[in-house]
C-alpha cells in the first residue's frame, strides 16, 4: 500500500480548498484508501491506498503541461 496526493484527470493534485471537511476522506476511501485529509487546505492526501492508484509525483508532474 502507499500514501500520497490524489490526482485529477489533468495531472494536478486534487484540490480541496472550497470543499467540505470530509471531502478528502471520502475521495480517499473511494479509491480504496484507509483515510485522508486536506493538506494545508490545498490538496487531498491519502493513506494506505492500493498500489494501483495513480498518485501525484513531483518527478512525473503533468500539471499545467
Curated annotation (Swiss-Prot):
Subcellular location: Secreted
Domain LCN-type CS-alpha/beta, first and last residues per copy: 2-64
Function per UniProt: Alpha toxins bind voltage-independently at site-3 of sodium channels (Nav) and inhibit the inactivation of the activated channels, thereby blocking neuronal transmission.
Identification of the protein by name: Sodium channel toxin 2
GO terms for cellular component: extracellular region
Stored Pfam families: Toxin_3 (PF00537)
UniProt-listed GO biological process terms: defense response
The record's note on its domains: Has the structural arrangement of an alpha-helix connected to antiparallel beta-sheets by disulfide bonds (CS-alpha/beta).
GO MF term set: sodium channel inhibitor activity; toxin activity
Keywords: Amidation, Disulfide bond, Secreted
Residue positions, PTM Lysine amide: 65
Record family assignment: Belongs to the long (4 C-C) scorpion toxin superfamily. Sodium channel inhibitor family.
Tissue expression pattern: Expressed by the venom gland.
CDD domains the record matches: neurotoxins_LC_scorpion (cd23106)
Native species: Tityus metuendus
Disulfide partners: 12-63, 16-38, 24-44, 28-46
Amino acid at each position: 500500500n502507499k500514501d500520497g496526493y490524489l490526482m485529477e484527470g489533468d495531472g494536478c493534485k486534487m484540490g480541496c480548498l472550497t470543499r467540505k471537511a470530509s471531502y478528502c476522506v471520502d475521495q480517499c476511501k473511494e479509491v480504496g484508501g484507509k483515510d485522508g485529509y486536506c493538506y494545508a487546505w490545498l490538496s487531498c492526501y491519502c493513506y494506505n491506498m492500493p498500489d494501483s492508484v495513480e498518485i501525484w509525483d513531483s518527478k512525473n508532474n503533468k500539471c499545467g503541461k
